[in-house]
Amino acid sequence: MSTIKPSPSNNNLKVRSRPRRKSSIGKIDLGDTVPSLGTMFETKESKTAAKRRMQRLSEATKNDSDLVKKIWFSFREISYRHAWIAPLMILIAVYSAYFTSGNTTKTNVLHRFVAVSYQIGDTNAYGKGINDLCFVFYYMIFFTFLREFLMDVVIRPFAIRLHVTSKHRIKRIMEQMYAIFYTGVSGPFGIYCMYHSDLWFFNTKAMYRTYPDFTNPFLFKVFYLGQAAFWAQQACILVLQLEKPRKDHNELTFHHIVTLLLIWSSYVFHFTKMGLPIYITMDVSDFLLSFSKTLNYLDSGLAFFSFAIFVVAWIYLRHYINLKILWSVLTQFRTEGNYVLNFATQQYKCWISLPIVFVLIGALQLVNLYWLFLIFRVLYRILWRGILKDDRSDSESDEESDESSTTPTDSTPTKKDI
């Protein structure tokens, strides 16, 4: 006769803890933010290389040659851990050579790197030329330093002091808070330039009325070239693929290609008055997006309210204003200002440039419409279905899964609508 065995105690059962629910806002794959050197995904290869470097540093020094090699490996290891050190050394070297030379005029070869060139006499007007590329290149290095320094020295400790323990969240907060810092400066800077011009408030007729704009005011040129440096630096990080691509990697890459084409063509062919309003629409909306994401990562109760404001601003700036500019290409491009092709006088506002301008701005609008679709999907999930499943990138999912394998999960589920 078979005996019935008692069931094991519930204390011995392995209860699979329910993962903590996440909000969609912080991980929705949209926007212009590109991962940095300091937040890139650590692959097995990079971890193995780091172990090799540490082994070399632990080896005994037998002669001067070994000592030099150890110093070099020490510098490389520090630079890998703190990516802002190498660009800082370049900046210090150039600035030191420039200011200690006793010649801070345009005759100094370093002047074209540290300051804007082509000032017209003693006026506030600045022309354009090949030296502007030197300025853009140098400030690409500056933005590399600025981003890595702020994220490593300022934002990371700040996030830890706010009791953020997840390595993944700290990295995402670092990226978004730097975006808040940059767009929080560039957005008002661009609005200031627009306010002190005839472009206020997104006056489309003024974009064409004075064409060709061979010169720009000092602050206008600093803003324009600074933006070019910022976007070029981001594009380099994106091209190098230092981060595992997110789901909208192709759209993000396409967005950067179109943006850089717009920057280059508008500057070279004297359409800078068209570029300024587009810069502003991107910066202000990006500021609100990053602010909403940061509040979401910090589990703030204001995250949904902030996200709602962002959605309204995104639709107004990236769609209404940009479509208004796109419509002006069809209606005002021909009628306002000169409309003639003349290579001798650099007159390029003509029947050839019209479709090119329209296609580039239209391509930018298509990417923004795709991201708007993702935004509406998030709103639908939150408001109607209550589903908080993420549209996150592979890198984010993998990183969180790696983290969860080494850290205990919270067995008590928490509901977060935003």
From Swiss-Prot:
Residue numbers bearing the Phosphoserine modification: 23-24
Binding-site positions, hexacosanoate: 224, 231, 255, 259, 262-263, 265-266, 269, 271, 274-275, 278-279, 282-283, 286, 318, 343, 348, 352-353, 356-357, 360-361, 371
Catalytic activity line of the entry: a very long-chain fatty acyl-CoA + a sphingoid base = an N-(very-long-chain fatty acyl)-sphingoid base + CoA + H(+); hexacosanoyl-CoA + sphinganine = N-hexacosanoylsphinganine + CoA + H(+); eicosanoyl-CoA + sphinganine = N-eicosanoylsphinganine + CoA + H(+); a fatty acyl-CoA + sphinganine = an N-acylsphinganine + CoA + H(+)
GO cellular component: acyl-CoA ceramide synthase complex; endoplasmic reticulum; endoplasmic reticulum membrane; nuclear periphery
Residues binding hexacosanoyl-CoA: 231, 255, 259, 262, 265-266, 271, 274-275, 278-279, 282, 286, 289, 293, 296, 307, 318, 348, 352-353, 356-357, 360, 371
Disordered: region residues: 1-25, 390-418
Primary location: endoplasmic reticulum
Subcellular location: Endoplasmic reticulum membrane
Transmembrane segments: 82-102, 131-155, 173-194, 218-240, 250-268, 274-295, 306-334, 354-382
Regulation: As part of the ceramide synthase complex, inhibited by the sphinganine analog mycotoxin, fumonisin B1 (FB1). Activated by ACB1, as part of the ceramide synthase complex.
Consequence when changing residue 186 to A: Does not affect the enzymatic activity of the LAC1-LIP1 complex
Keyword Transmembrane: yes
Sites where a glycan is attached: 103
Pathway: Lipid metabolism; sphingolipid metabolism
Keywords: Acetylation, Endoplasmic reticulum, Glycoprotein, Lipid biosynthesis, Lipid metabolism, Membrane, Phosphoprotein, Transferase, Transmembrane, Transmembrane helix
Domain of life: Eukaryota
Protein's job: Component of the ceramide synthase complex that catalyzes the transfer of the acyl chain from acyl-CoA to a sphingoid base, with high selectivity toward hexacosanoyl-CoA (C26:0-CoA). N-acylates sphinganine and phytosphingosine bases to form dihydroceramides and phytoceramides, respectively. Redundant with LAG1. Facilitates ER-to-Golgi transport of GPI-anchored proteins. Has a lower affinity for phytosphingosine (PHS) than dihydrosphingosine (DHS); PHS is required for the synthesis of phytoceramides and the formation of nuclear envelopes.
Protein name in the entry: Ceramide synthase LAC1
Origin species: Saccharomyces cerevisiae (strain ATCC 204508 / S288c) (Baker's yeast)
